[in-house]
């Protein structure tokens, strides 16, 4: 087995055992990675998980999701060069870690690799695919965020240089990080499905959709040059409206999937 230099953090409250086992198993199938779970103290994960599914369990600091992920990432040893996190109900694609790490191994100027992401419903049925593309890394500064966080990989050195995750954001902290990362190197798009994002009512992203849209708008606007910010409302409100509509459509179609099972 090749040297393990990839670290994946899985934050969880320990309330979705079946999904969590599927998530951890998918990471094992995605490539050679050190898997660290961060969960509230006292959550009896050992009763539902076998030791081969993860490498380390860390206590959640209790300061929010972004703080928990950031804490766990900073706990990785110097041997870990590439990092990311994955929701406890999402999945990595087969061999996706090998696929995502290759461009960064070949070019030290590449600080992040992202690809396509499938949206699946509660039962794992495919709803649609976020195909993304090279354009997404430019679009996210003034339009919808189409850079898929699930399945991506980030160079840890660049993550730390960028200051890690902003603990002030509850939902859109990935967008804030991606924009900051561009100051330290290149973002590379690979045209392959790297992960599956589970769209269901219990998902934080789905349940907190309005707050996520609001945070993303704030992040995009603050990243603009000062002389452009005052004009941001011209395109921000139509964009926010469109994002909400897309979210409602995904919720609708995921509901249709459930009702026909």
Role assignments for model-derived ranges:
Residues 21-25, 70, 93-106, 132, ...:
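Short alpha-helix within the catalytic core of nucleotide-sugar-dependent glycosyltransferases
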Residues 38-47, 87:
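A conserved acidic beta->alpha catalytic loop
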Residues 22-34:
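Short, acidic, metal-binding catalytic loop of nucleotide-sugar glycosyltransferases
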Residues 79-91:
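Short beta-strand-to-loop acidic/aromatic patch adjacent to the donor-nucleotide binding site
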Residues 4-7, 34, 176:
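Cell-envelope/extracellular polymer assembly enzymes that use nucleotide-activated donors
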Residues 9, 135-215:
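Conserved nucleotide-sugar donor-binding catalytic segment
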Residues 91, 95-127:
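Conserved donor NDP-sugar-binding/catalytic core segment of glycosyltransferases
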Residues 60-78:
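Glycine-rich, basic loop-to-helix element that forms the pyrophosphate-binding segment
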